């Protein structure tokens, strides 16, 4: 199973929190101390918490469950998109649209619209339209791709959500909480761990730290999917037994 060591975290700067004046007292138990007015996160908490989350993700992926990657702030966007795509998992990296989970029926209609427009752009429909109409549909498609393209293949609500910067993604977390979807969240010293089922105390701003988290989560997804592919499902067992009986 994928594991991340304390050395990995130290080299990625996971232990650097925010300036001490911005701290959230609810994160007190995860803080080791302060250096140059910057809180230092106690990695003795972070390492086991993150590895527990990785084990959970591996097990979920082995059961073909969907993990939604969420990171819409600039420092996280590129990495979240790349790693979720690598793992074959849904993601939101542009902007969280209110109701993305709690009003999924409406979102599903937008996904259908995006699918229709994509088909039209490929089957020659756009070429038959006026230049203005084709441009309008093309822009509509690009806008939808940017906002919901990462979840177009989700096929329903996710089974868990992985979040970078829980303060920035508070609306997404509230929606997940309302629906009972477990949340794995990277929580910095200025944030509240409330509503987070699996708290990963750590730096949520440094690109190297964000890469470390997202890459490890993606690796766990791939590890789980691989083990799932190597285990025959129930129907295959039945077929094999029937064949042997004959």
From Swiss-Prot:
Region (Disordered): 225-246
Stored CDD domains: RPS2
One cellular component (GO) term of this entry: cytosolic small ribosomal subunit
Keyword Coiled coil: no
Keyword entries, A-Z: Ribonucleoprotein, Ribosomal protein
Cystine bridges: none
Pfam families in alphabetical order: Ribosomal_S2
SUPFAM superfamilies membership: Ribosomal protein S2
GO biological process, one term: translation
GO molecular function annotations of the record: structural constituent of ribosome
Keyword hit for Ribonucleoprotein: yes
Family: Belongs to the universal ribosomal protein uS2 family.
Protein name (record): Small ribosomal subunit protein uS2
UniProt source species: Cellvibrio japonicus (strain Ueda107) (Pseudomonas fluorescens subsp. cellulosa)
Biological classification of the source: Bacteria, Pseudomonadati, Pseudomonadota, Gammaproteobacteria, Cellvibrionales
Gene behind this protein: rpsB
